[in-house]
Amino acid sequence: SSYDACMFVGYHAKKGTLEGVMSHTYSGGNIESLHVNGMEVGETGLNARIAAHHGVPLAFLAGDVATTKEAKEVNPGIVTVAVKDAIGRMSAKCLHPEVAREEIRKGAANAARLKLKPMAIKAPVELLIRFTDARRADAAAFIPTTERVDGKTIRLVAPDMIVAYHGFIAAVLCGTAVS
């Protein structure tokens, strides 16, 4: 890859996270949870794995307090900036925009100096996608190579993270099509 690192700004915690501002996993009304190779992940963990597939480590994340904790589970060496702290799922105490902008700028500059390695992704990649209801899992179970685990969960095994991601997006779209 021609990139040294990736940086995520404006991120949120995975669905169901206590004190996660607007927490959801990709499609809040559709996806209950996502596990990659046995670990529950949100968008931070999923996107960091996609970057890692390309040899790029996650070096910086800005978001709410809960998301910065989630990011450190993905990559303990990451630089994070918390720009808001949850009062509830839909409310937060936020830094003033000028303060947040400066903190993000400083954090990103510090992260750019790091020499991090991308996380290792074990192949094949197994996804467990749990939907918010069985109708959505019914629709996604039509995707070739998926296996139904229970009423709301499908399993998808892929040779690498990119194929797994494409399968995940297909499952999200199938689940979303059910109203």
Model regions: which residues?
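A broad structural signal for short, well-ordered beta-strand segments within beta-sheet-rich domains
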Residues: 30-33, 58, 121-126
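C-terminal accessory domains and tails appended to enzymatic cores
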Residues: 100-179
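Active-site rim beta-loop-alpha module in soluble metabolic enzymes
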Residues: 53-58, 62-111
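Short acidic, glycine/serine/threonine-rich loops at helix termini
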Residues: 17-21, 71-74, 141-142
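Active-site glycine-rich loop that binds ribose-phosphate moieties when present
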Residues: 29-54, 61-67
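Short coil/turn connectors at secondary-structure junctions
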Residues: 1-5, 13, 54-57, 76-77, ...
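Short beta-strand segments
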Residues: 6-11, 61-62, 130
